[in-house]
Curated annotation (Swiss-Prot):
The gene is WDR62. The modification Phosphothreonine is found at T46, T1050, T1275. It is found in: Nucleus; Cytoplasm, Cytoskeleton, Spindle pole; Cytoplasm, Cytoskeleton, Microtubule organizing center, Centrosome; Cytoplasm, Cytoskeleton, Microtubule organizing center, Centrosome, Centriole. InterPro entries: Quinoprotein_ADH-like_sf (IPR011047), WD40/YVTN_repeat-like_dom_sf (IPR015943), WD40_MABP1-WDR62_1st (IPR056161), WD40_MABP1-WDR62_2nd (IPR056162), WD40_repeat_dom_sf (IPR036322), WD40_rpt (IPR001680), WDR62 (IPR052779), WDR62-MABP1_CC (IPR056364). GO terms for cellular component: centriole; centrosome; cytoplasm; nucleus; spindle pole. This is WD repeat-containing protein 62. Residues 1008-1026, 1193-1202 have a biased composition (Pro residues). It comes from Sus scrofa (Pig). The modification Phosphoserine is found at S33, S501, S943, S1095, S1125, S1151, S1235, S1255, S1256. Residues 937-948 have a biased composition (Low complexity). WD repeats lie at residues 109-150, 153-194, 196-234, 291-330, 357-396, 402-450, 490-529, 532-574, 578-618, 626-665, 671-713, 714-752, 803-846, 1138-1180.
């Protein structure tokens, strides 16, 4: 609120005389009364000119101030005539009438905080001093509230001011850096005398006869005399004449208060020092007497004709006789720090003394001689007015308790018609850095449930979130007292944000340390306290009640959002980390799909939709808007259609919550400086209030952007705003510790009420059709509520808004398709299209990406011509290959889809696992329960019985239906999966993604377009275990050059990679994060972990600390169903007892803090860094116990650089999430691209061969296929014992799951041919210990449960390596006496299965030797020679096989059908499931073994150089030559790159 003319606030009488417009009466009827401005609700219809400036300024008035900023007696004064008390509150002078408990306010128009004030002797004027540069001394008329005079004469702030008793002069003293003392003739606005002082002055006082005044300060007591005769003769400024008081031995004291005597003591001057000395000076400036107050510290002083009041520490106010300095009494102490004001219902409670209680210090005193009232201000920002007529019976007249530090947030308690309310109607809450949450109510009518307490008429309750009381007192100003308490002040304390649940039962609050608390509002008990974040919580939001959900979102400066389930005792549902900087606001909306919208300092707005998965609720990103300015706050209107965002450029941008498109942008602040910090939409959705960093507040029409009112009064930035539900008040809070209640003008209130009435009328016909339940689909469950049909502003839209509402609702969504027809060649974003793109689309006026179809075939020219090539050889961007990723399918077209849900990450399992790691052993915390695994194996058994072979184009990645590892999606998402909907996997076309983002997404396997349902060949990649057809044999081989998406296929691609990713490194040496979740526990002396907190954020980030940061560039995915292998007994060479420990086969599973020792001369690396590589070259997966490796130091393990990023994807080491990594936008781009830098990761010594060029394209393609199989199927290793990390979705990046790049970056490996392993180098993994290094024995298992490595690698060797390895000469076991023996028994395999396997040893003999064991002694093999094939033996074997398999199958079905399963039955069920999977994998492996041994001679390869395998006939000889040429260019480019490096 601004003032008129000279700057004072003048009440507008015209506004007060306006007739009240009743709610529901049309606003047109009110035009008969001439208001100062047209009715707001008609402005859009009539398009009238804006209201005059004075009307705008007076539509909102300041009604009440809850707060005080007085730091000493200079900020408190009293009118001697009326008894009114004036004190400072930011930029406002509050004039309090204690009898009536009413306030009047004078606002400083200069927007500078006030530092001092004083009443004139007659009480008509108030003089104020300011802070800041070039402060002014202003004179205000108390009655008119306007400015009378303004005097400029200081530079750096005014410390104290005073009227002379004869009202001729005003004295002002500057701050320490100003040190100017001015005497003003305020009626003439001139300085009559001036001087500079040499030390800091704290207080001053005029003598009763106005002949002199006294200033006191640091070792300073000085008397200044006014020469009247000199003033009459000299017209200019004259120097002041000053004389110092004679202090004697007290000259080293710092004096903080001074008062000249009154009445009989008019010739005396009284001073008080910080050290607790009360001194009296006589007329000759001589220290006459002094006494010790016997306190640790004193701060203020005031006198009457008979009494002296000295304010001291611990709430003490001592009273002395003025003429003798005899001690009389002490004032009663105020409340003790930490008092429960709700318990103070009786007056006697004030005088109840608590043992060891601490009381607030007294900082300011003023005395009313007429009423004998002493006003006291205490250090906790409380005010007491004591009646001291009888010092032996002192009573309290009035009191109030305010916040003592920054107020961060305000919430208005919801309105309830029944008895559910926990607080009276009209209550609101504020939270502050003083560690309190305060409940206020301005209603003067007492509520039956809430009686008024004796401390305050407005304060209902104080909740103390911490037991520490040091923050309850104002620690921001120490007036040269030093750190007398000797304790350090934690400036990061306090409650930062809070939110009341929609049902009014719970209060969620987040503090500045990252803790989340939940209070129950009936009894104010703390229900939940969670260390949620590593930095201060910036936003809390409950889900809307109409959504049918009870969720709480917590956003923090640590850039993470935690979604908690209220119904499950605030358990963690999901953690989102899309943002790369502080998250400033998060909101829920219930329009159509239930959404979460968040904005942050990274200039991004993320729109997420909710999906119901089997393991809980997950939010998947649907839109991303990237602005060019920082976003500080946002709010959603009542229709849930639009979100208003406060931006740093002082604009308010309004976005559609459905499609994320910007609808409006208008100015949110009337000034030209600062940034918008807060925005809040009123309950009717008619207006919004904004706060700017210039400390101003604006009320703006939400639809037109016109400024309705502007106010100011806070001295610090406004940190929170809320409209009350009665549409009458606006509450603002600020960093100046004050709460302002603004009264809205009648025209604003009536317009809001009319809008609410119209909304209710429109909603009545829809009451029977609203439904907030989940809309369940066979493939996915999306949280939806019925869309509100409320228009932007009923009957008040502009033409373009009316046209928009006439459009079908479907246009706001990403269009769905009935079939997989081709999408446009270019993927459209929110930006404008270039001319060639418009021509390509056949429409030059295309502006929306909702529905596009090419109308004519236009071929672009230049470099874009290659992008439209129709040949099977694809370049970087071909939109037709991405057609199934960007347009959702109708639900009926998803009948046969295996994709059920797209799950995001969860931390519930991680949190539970971290608490009890020994309970689950090596099992993943979110590993499937038996019934979950049973469904998985049942699907497998069905596929076994029906003998169905699923080809590549028909195979689809599946998601778990149980409570599996969320976010662990298949690595096969680069396949063309026609049934995957873009709503689940990809952002819609209007999501704000740029074409540059999509240009990086050529990672998909670019298969040719499908002209007919039966193409000549299909691209097949084995799905992960757990999906139907996961273990089926591949029907057709892959096509070289087409299926290998990990290799750049053109020089343009290679150039693109070099240009965009040449700065990426695959072996960062300086990793900031060390240790995993286990390392977060009790830190030892030499542990130097970056964050000791075990918050949810710390545990979330700890999952990404151990692996190489280079893997973060590539979002990796786990198989949906991680399988448990049979238990393998492992023996330690040191003589420890063997213990059974379930390990995952083929994963290199190891415990944190332990490493496997490689060959001599190599540094120790974790097993997970080399075991997958071993598997990829041998086809076998070693299962090594962590107990067989000597433990290393207990220091946090150093980061491990994986051999290749492609391998890292297969191993699935979680990506590092840190504050030094790329932003969300750049990370999204990098996640779909790769660097061609050479790998710096560890390489096995046996594989360290010099790079050599492949002999042919076939070898290069086969190597790429090998790497593809490894990156696709290797099961991840764990970085924490007893659990397997489930990679989160990297901030809901499932939308880009199909665009993941898996290109390997090991250039040397690309130059190497597949290793030629001789049969003599092959060994069988046995249970006998194999020496790796001296004194280190590793026991390995011959057979393990099938894993993706076993299934895919064996199939891989069938097509590429094994024919070359085994065909040149038959396997002769006698020629290899050192071969290890086959085991007698296989752990985890039933006896009948073991006998079956033993009877057919030929199928098991050709096994490779692990490269990690090359050069070590081999154990002689005990393999019986193959005997003659007898039909009787075959029949017996077949009979036993059928019987055993049927018995096992029946037993398994019986256990699965039971509802309750015991622990033993669960173990047996797991054993059977693992065995079935193992049999399936062995059958696949047996197929190629039999084909190799029993093939005719002409089918066997010749012993000469192997020829490149022809996996699929090429389309033409020209294409074959073209691929050869591209291969040559690629090899040359890679070699040049390697040579330069």
């Amino acid at each position: 609120m601004a003032a008129l003319g000279t700057g004072g606030y003048v009440r507008n009488d015209a506004v007060e005389k306006l007739p009240t417009i009743m709610a529901g009466v049309p606003a047109r009827r009110a035009q008969s009364s001439p208001p100062p401005a047209p009715p707001l609700c008609l402005r859009r219809r009539t398009r009238l000119t804006a209201a005059p400036e004075d009307a705008v300024q007076n539509r909102v008035s300041l009604e009440k101030v809850l707060g005080i900023t007085a730091q000493n007696s200079s900020g408190l004064t009293c009118d001697p005539g009326t008894g009114h008390v004036a004190y400072l509150a930011g930029c406002v002078v509050v004039i309090l009438n204690p009898k009536e408990n009413k306030q009047q306010h004078i606002l400083n128009t200069a927007r500078k905080s006030l530092s001092a004030l004083a009443f004139s002797p007659d009480g008509k004027y108030i003089v104020t001093g300011e802070n800041g540069h070039r402060p002014a001394v202003r004179i205000w008329d108390v009655e008119e509230k306007n400015q009378v005079a303004e005097m400029l004469g200081h530079k750096y702030g005014v410390a104290c001011v005073a009227f002379s008793p004869n009202m001729k002069h005003i004295v002002s003293m500057g701050y320490q850096h100003d040190m100017v003392l001015n005497v003003w003739d305020w009626k003439k606005d001139i300085v009559v005398a001036s001087n500079k002082v040499s030390c800091r002055v704290i207080a001053l006082s005029f003598s009763e006869d106005s002949s002199y005044f006294v200033t006191v300060g640091n070792r300073h007591v000085r008397f200044w005399f006014l020469e009247v005769s000199t003033e009459a003769k000299v017209t200019g400024t004259v120097p002041l004449v000053g004389r110092s008081g004679i202090l004697g031995e007290l000259h080293d004291n710092v004096f903080c208060g001074v008062a000249c005597g009154r009445g009989q003591m008019a010739g005396s001057t009284f001073c008080v020092s910080y050290s607790g000395l009360l001194c009296q000076f006589n007329e000759k400036r001589v220290l006459e007497k002094w006494i010790n107050l016997k306190v640790s510290l004193s701060s203020c002083l005031c006198v009457s004709q008979e009494l002296i009041f000295c304010g001291c520490t611990d709430g003490i106010v001592r009273i002395f006789q003025a003429h003798s300095l005899h001690y009389l009494a002490n004032l009663p102490k105020p409340h003790y720090l930490g008092v429960d004001v709700a318990q103070g219902l009786e007056p006697s409670f004030l005088f109840h003394r608590k043992a060891e209680a601490v009381y607030p210090d007294t900082v300011a005193l003023t005395f009313d001689p007429n009423h004998q009232w002493l006003s006291c201000v205490y250090k906790d920002h409380s005010i007491y007015i004591w009646d001291v007529k009888d010092i032996n019976k002192v009573g309290k007249m009035w009191s109030e308790l305010f916040h003592s530090s920054y107020v961060w947030n305000v919430e208005v308690y919801p309105e309830f018609e029944d008895q559910r309310a926990c607080l009276p109607s009209g209550s609101f809450l504020t939270c502050s850095s003083d560690n309190t949450i305060r409940f206020w109510n301005l209603d003067s009518n007492p509520d039956s449930h809430w009686q008024k307490n004796i401390f305050s008429d407005t304060l209902l309750k104080v909740v103390y979130v911490e037991s520490d009381i040091q923050h309850l007192q104002d620690m921001s100003h120490f007036p040269d007292r030093g750190s007398e308490n000797g304790m350090a002040v934690d400036m990061k304390a306090g409650v930062r944000v809070m939110q009341v649940s929609p049902d009014g039962q719970h209060l969620a609050s987040g503090d500045r340390s990252g803790n989340l608390r939940i209070h129950e509002l009936h009894f104010m008990d703390e229900l939940v306290r969670v260390e949620a974040h590593d930095a201060e919580v910036l936003c809390l939001e409950y889900s809307k009640p109409e959504t049918g959900l009870t969720l709480l979102a917590s956003a923090s400066r640590d850039r993470l959002i935690h979604v908690l389930n209220v119904e499950k005792n605030y358990s963690l549902e999901q953690t989102l980390d899309d943002h790369s900087s502080s998250i400033t606001a998060v909101k829920f909306t219930g329009s159509r799909d239930i959404q979460m919208i968040s904005c942050g300092a990274d200039k991004s707005i993320y729109f997420r939709s909710a999906q119901q998965a089997s393991d809980g609720l997950h939010f998947v990103r649907t839109h991303h808007v990237a602005e060019k300015t920082t976003l500080y706050d946002m709010d959603i209107d009542i229709t849930q259609k639009y979100v208003a965002v406060a931006c740093q450029d002082r604009n308010v941008r309004v976005y559609n919550t459905v499609n994320g498109k910007q609808k409006k942008c208008y100015k949110g602040s009337q000034g030209d400086e600062g940034s918008l910090l807060k925005v809040h939409v009123d309950p009717s959705g008619t207006f919004l209030a904004t706060s700017c960093s210039d400390k101003s507040i604006s009320v703006i029409d939400f639809y037109s952007g016109e400024c309705v009112a502007k106010m100011f009064g806070h001295s610090e930035i406004i940190t929170g705003m809320k409209f009350t539900y009665d549409c009458r008040h606006l509450i603002t809070v600020s960093g100046d510790s004050c709460v302002f209640i603004w009264h809205l003008g009648p025209e604003i209130t009536n317009c809001m009420k009319q809008h609410l009435l119209e909304i209710d009328q429109r909603e009545q016909p829809q009451q029977n059709t609203k439904d907030g339940k989940w809309s369940r689909d066979p493939r996915q469950e999306t949280c939806t509520s019925m869309p509100s049909e409320i228009s932007l502003s009923p009957g008040e839209q502009t033409e373009d808004e009316l046209e928009e509402e006439c459009e079908p609702e479907e246009l706001l969504k990403t269009p769905s398709k009935e079939s997989l027809d081709s999408d446009p060649r270019c993927l459209l974003t929110n930006g404008k299209l270039p001319l060639w793109a418009k021509r390509l689309l056949g429409d030059d006026d295309v502006a929306d990406g909702s529905a596009f179809h090419a109308k004519r075939s236009y071929q672009p020219h230049g470099r874009w011509a290659e992008r439209a090539d129709q040949e099977p050889l694809k370049t970087i961007l071909d939109a037709r290959d991405l057609d199934c990723y960007f347009t959702p399918m109708k639900p009926e077209s998803l009948e046969d889809s295996i994709l059920d849900t797209v799950e995001s990450q969860r931390l519930a399992g991680l949190l539970s696992q971290s608490e009890s790691p020994q309970e689950d052993g090596c099992r993943h915390p979110s590993l499937t329960p038996p019934q979950r695994e049973s469904s998985e194996v049942s699907e497998l058994l069905c596929s076994l019985e029906s003998e169905v072979t699923i080809t590549g184009t028909d195979s689809k990645p599946c998601a778990e239906e149980g409570e599996g590892a969320p976010g662990d999606q298949q690595d096969d998402f680069y396949l063309r999966v026609p049934s995957i909907t873009s709503k689940d996997l990809n952002p819609p076309e209007d999501s704000g993604e740029s074409e540059a983002d999509l240009e990086c997404s050529f990672t998909a396997v670019h298969s040719p377009p499908r002209p007919d349902p039966d193409p000549p060949f299909d691209v097949a990649v084995p799905p992960a275990p757990g999906c139907p057809g996961a273990t089926e044999e591949l029907a057709r081989p892959e096509v070289p050059g087409l299926s290998n998406g990990s290799l750049p296929q053109t020089p343009e691609q290679e150039k693109f990679l070099r240009h965009h990713f040449e700065t990426l490194t695959d072996a960062p040496a300086e990793e900031l994060f060390h240790g995993s979740l286990r390392d977060l526990k009790a830190s030892e002396a030499k542990d130097d972990f970056f964050n000791p907190r075990l918050s949810i954020s710390a545990q979330f980030l700890s999952r990404f600390q151990k692996p190489s940061r280079f893997t973060h560039t590539f979002p990796t995915r786990l198989p949906r169903h991680p399988m448990q292998s049979p238990e393998v007994k492992l023996t330690d060479l040191a003589g420890s007892q063997p213990r059974a420990e379930p390990l995952r086969a083929g994963t290199g599973y190891t415990s944190p803090g332990r490493t496997n020792v490689l060959s001599a001369g190599k540094a120790e690396e974790p097993l997970e860094a080399w075991s997958p590589l071993t598997s990829c070259l041998t086809g076998l997966a070693p299962c090594v116990s962590s107990s067989s490796v000597p433990p290393t130091d207990k220091t946090p393990p150093t980061p491990t650089a994986l051999p290749t990023p492609g391998l890292a994807q297969g191993v699935h080491t979680p990506a590092t999430s840190s504050y030094v990594e790329a932003t969300a936008g750049s990370r999204a781009k990098m996640s779909r691209s790769i660097s061609l830098e050479d790998s710096k990761g560890p390489v096995l010594a046996e594989l360290a061969r010099p790079p050599c060029r492949p002999s042919s394209l076939g070898e290069l393609s086969s190597l790429g296929q090998e790497l593809r199989a490894i990156t696709t199927t290797v099961t991840p290793s764990s970085d924490s014992e007893g659990q397997e990390p489930a990679l989160p979705s990297r901030g809901n990046h499932e939308a880009r799951a199909s665009l993941k790049l898996t290109l390997s970056s090991i250039c040397d490996r690309l130059l190497l041919p597949p290793p030629q392993l001789e049969p003599s180098a092959m060994c069988v993994w046995s249970q006998e210990p194999v020496a790796i290094q001296p004194n280190v024995m590793v026991t390995t298992a011959s057979f393990s449960a099938p894993s993706p490595v076993n299934v895919s690698a064996s199939r891989l060797h069938n097509s590429t390596f094994l024919p070359r390895f085994l065909a040149p000469e038959p396997l002769n076991t006698s020629a290899h006496p050192n071969s290890p023996p086959l085991p007698e028994a296989r752990p985890g395999v039933p006896g009948n299965i073991t006998s079956l396997l033993e009877s057919a040893p030929d199928a098991l003999s050709p096994v490779h030797r692990c490269p990690g064991h090359c050069g070590q002694p081999r154990v002689p093999a005990r393999v019986p020679p193959p005997g003659p094939l007898e039909l009787s033996n075959v029949g017996s074997i077949v009979h036993r096989l059928q019987t055993a398999f049927q018995e096992a199958l029946d037993l398994y079905h019986m256990m699965v059908s039971r509802d309750e399963v015991s622990a033993e039955q669960q173990q047996a069920q797991t054993e059977l499931a693992s065995t079935f999977l193992w049999i399936h994998s062995q059958l696949e492996a047996n197929d190629w073994l039999v084909g190799t041994d029993g093939a005719p001679a002409q089918a066997l390869p010749s012993p000469g150089p192997p020829s490149p395998p022809t996996l699929c006939p090429l389309a033409s000889p020209d294409l074959h030559a073209l691929l050869e040429h591209y291969s040559e260019l690629l090899v040359q480019a890679v070699r040049r790159k390697a040579q330069r490096d």
